[in-house]
């Protein structure tokens, strides 16, 4: 928290809201949120209940702070879709602003999880985005399935990396597409296990927009 506050101060923030657990959850939160299909695919399928927890804490935050705008990074592509669905469901007058993924010089998407990587793991982690970029170029002259399989194979060929899932989806609905002609807005969302622990890293790339 201290490190985050220092960064926020450099950015000119006037206030930081850092509530205790008791402030956020004065009573047990029994609300259940589900917005198929965006909460049931990809992360929703591999981590059941994850987005319900996200919606619980984000909705509490919105109710307490009452913001006009909320900013979310595109690295977690699915989370943005879930939060937008939550805002529509709750009828909040709130603009969700999508922020470009910020990357290290070697292409690794910035994330708090990166601090958990060992030196060896940190050295191979950028190969995830390298494979995604190569896949985008490859996809210009190959089928969607061929592109999908190449990205997965390229990452799995790296010792210490293992793809949990790689989904090529409609950028709005998050439903998997079978052909490049299925949508005008196509994104690839990936989760990769890195290292022996392992650390779970997510990333994405836009194929068509």
Describe the residue ranges of each PLM region.
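Nucleotidyltransferase catalytic core that binds NTPs
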Residues: 1-161, 169, 173, 205
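Phosphate/ribose-recognition catalytic cores of enzymes acting on nucleotide-derived substrates
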Residues: 150-209
């Amino acid at each position: 928290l201290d490190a985050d506050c220092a960064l926020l101060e450099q950015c000119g923030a006037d206030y930081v809201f850092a509530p205790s657990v008791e402030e956020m959850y004065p009573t047990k939160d029994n609300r259940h949120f589900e917005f198929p299909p965006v909460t049931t695919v990809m992360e929703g399928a591999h981590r059941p209940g994850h987005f319900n927890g996200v919606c619980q804490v984000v909705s509490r935050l919105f109710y307490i702070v009452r913001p006009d705008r909320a900013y979310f990074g595109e690295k977690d592509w699915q989370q943005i879709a879930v939060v937008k669905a939550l805002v529509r469901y709750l009828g909040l007058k709130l603009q969700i602003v999508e922020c470009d993924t910020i990357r290290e010089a070697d292409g690794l998407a910035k994330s708090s999880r990166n601090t958990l990587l060992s030196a060896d793991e940190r050295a191979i982690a950028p190969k995830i985005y390298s494979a995604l970029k190569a896949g985008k170029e490859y996809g210009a002259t190959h089928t969607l399935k061929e592109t999908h399989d190449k990205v997965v194979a390229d990452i799995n060929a790296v010792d210490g990396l293992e793809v949990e899932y790689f989904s090529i989806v409609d950028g709005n609905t998050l439903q998997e597409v079978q052909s490049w002609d299925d949508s005008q807005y196509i994104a690839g969302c990936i989760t990769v296990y890195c290292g022996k622990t392992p650390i779970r890293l997510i990333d994405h790339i836009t194929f068509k927009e």
